[in-house]
Each structure stands twice: as structure tokens, then as C-alpha cells.
Regions:
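Short beta-strand/loop motif that positions the catalytic acidic residue
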Residues: 203, 209-211
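Conserved HGGG/HGGXW glycine-rich cap/lid loop of the alpha/beta-hydrolase fold
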Residues: 42-91
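Catalytic histidine-centered segment of alpha/beta-hydrolase-like enzymes
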Residues: 240-249
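Conserved hydrolase catalytic core segment
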Residues: 118-156
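Active-site nucleophile elbow and catalytic-triad environment of alpha/beta-hydrolase enzymes
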Residues: 184-199
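Conserved loop-alpha-helix segment in the C-terminal half of the alpha/beta-hydrolase fold
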Residues: 213-240
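Active-site loop/oxyanion-hole signature of alpha/beta-hydrolase fold enzymes
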Residues: 83-123
Length: 262
């Protein structure tokens, strides 16, 4: 039976500092925690924190491990956190000529094999949420539970504001100062993913679908993703945008932990 997470946002003067980085750890540049794995012909960079059951963190487009600077200090108290730089981003390798959500999801499935991990909890934000959804279909036995925030499964105006689509199209076709990597990552967002809603019915693991009530991903699209995944849970964060994990980290973290622990 589908469950709806009801969230009441309580503002405090500490909401933006309680999970600030401590001990001057610079995520995505921590030699004590950093590792490389050879997967799918590239060097995939990841950092490991904490102990316990594995939880992999998947960041958004153009981001890095540091995108989860408010999540790692929290979740490392409960899990063995494996935060990954996606292909062609952060410190991970890759080619602008070969980049797709399917390929990135394949990288993460392969990394779990490399680390001899039978199954893991998965938390994905934005593009990382797309990757997590694909993982739940591609290597379903390896995804114990999946939490995604601000994910879309189609790139058209049913999911994104038309103004955003036009901006990406103009950037990809006319920006002469952007790097090949920037063009490739934006082109991927412009034309991918293309996952039929029907395919989501094949997902077997428990899934928490999250979004901000002012997210760039249209609420009706988030709702349709939730409705298409069997036994999924839904959480819409109030007064929140696409970056709710950074905007309201305390609330976000506790919500995800509650889902993982239930």
C-alpha cells in the first residue's frame, strides 16, 4: 500500500548550520577517504565514511561528492557511506562522447560488484535520482531501498519548465565558451532520460520519491513517478526548491533515515 510522508517544516536558527562540515573535511578532496575503482573502462572516484550497511550517494548534474556535504556527516553515523563522483564529473574519468544515464547507472552497479557489496541503500539527488531509478531496474538485486529527490524520467515539458528546456537547448547549440564536458552534460539533460512510466512497475525495492514544493521538476511529474512505482512512498517538502537536501538538510536527512529504517 502506498504511503504518504507528511512533513511539517519547523524553522530554527540552527537549520543551516547543524550539519556544516566539521574538522575542515573537504568532501571530494579527502585523501584519507578517497579511492578509485576501474569500472566500465574509466576511473571512478569515491569516498568512504562510517561503518555499517552500505549507502551510496549519487549527486546531480555537474556536481560532485561535495554536493552531499550536509548528508555525509549525518549518514556516516548510521551507515557505511559510499559517496561517488559520477562519470565525467568531480574526479571521475570518462569521455564527453559517451555519457548517458544508463551508462552512469551501469558504473554504479559495477562499483558495487567491485566492492563485493551484495546490496546497498541508494540516495540520489536530481540526476543521481535518475541513476538510482535506472539502477533499481538494471541491477535490482543490488538496491535494497531507494530514495530519490528531484528526479525526472522524461526530458520534455511535462517534467520541466519549457523555459529551462529552451535555456539548455540554447546553451548546447550556441555557447562557444563552454567546455566539451559542460556541453555533453547539458545535452544529456536536454535529450535524456526516456523511461516509459510502464517500466517503473518492474521496480521491486521500496522507493521514496521526494521533491520540493517549488522544485524545478513539475509536481505532477513527481506524482506520476510515485504512482507508477509499486508500493512507493511520497514526500513533498514545503517551502523547498530543487536543492532541498542543501536548503533544509536536517529535515531531509531525518526523512530519508526514517524511510531507510522502517
Amino acid at each position: 500500500m502506498k504511503q504518504l510522508f507528511a512533513v511539517i517544516l519547523i524553522y530554527t536558527s540552527f537549520s543551516f548550520i547543524s550539519f556544516a562540515q566539521t574538522n575542515e573535511i573537504i568532501y571530494d578532496n579527502n585523501s584519507l577517504a578517497g579511492h578509485y575503482a576501474q569500472v566500465n573502462g574509466i576511473n571512478l572516484y569515491y569516498e568512504v565514511y562510517g561503518s555499517g550497511e552500505p549507502l551510496i550517494l549519487l549527486h546531480g548534474n555537474g556536481g560532485s561528492i561535495n554536493s552531499f556535504r550536509y548528508q555525509i556527516p549525518f549518514f556516516e553515523k548510521h551507515f557505511k557511506v559510499i559517496a561517488i563522483d559520477s562519470r565525467l564529473q568531480g574526479k571521475s574519468g570518462g569521455s564527453p562522447d559517451t555519457i548517458s544515464y544508463d551508462l552512469m547507472a551501469s558504473d554504479f552497479c559495477a562499483l558495487l560488484d567491485f566492492l563485493n557489496i551484495d546490496s546497498a541503500y541508494v540516495l540520489g539527488w536530481s540526476d543521481g535520482g535518475i541513476d538510482g531509478i535506472i539502477m533499481a531496474m538494471m541491477c535490482s538485486n543490488k538496491v535494497k531501498k531507494l530514495a530519490v529527490s528531484g528526479a525526472n524520467i522524461v526530458p520534455d515539458s511535462t517534467a520541466l519548465p519549457y523555459s529551462d528546456i529552451l535555456w539548455m537547448k540554447n546553451f548546447v547549440e550556441h555557447d562557444t565558451t563552454a567546455s566539451k564536458t559542460e556541453i555533453a552534460l547539458n545535452k544529456m539533460m536536454l535529450y535524456q532520460p526516456n523511461i516509459p512510466y510502464e517500466n517503473l512497475k518492474s521496480i521491486k525495492c521500496p522507493v521514496l520519491v521526494m521533491s520540493g514544493d517549488h522544485d524545478v521538476i513539475k509536481p505532477e511529474h513527481t506524482l506520476k513517478i510515485f504512482q507508477s512505482i509499486p508500493n512507493a512512498s511520497l514526500c513533498i517538502f514545503p517551502d523547498s526548491n530543487h536543492g532541498v537536501c542543501q536548503q533544509h538538510p536536517d529535515l531531509f536527512n531525518e526523512t530519508v533515515l526514517t524511510f531507510f529504517n522502517k
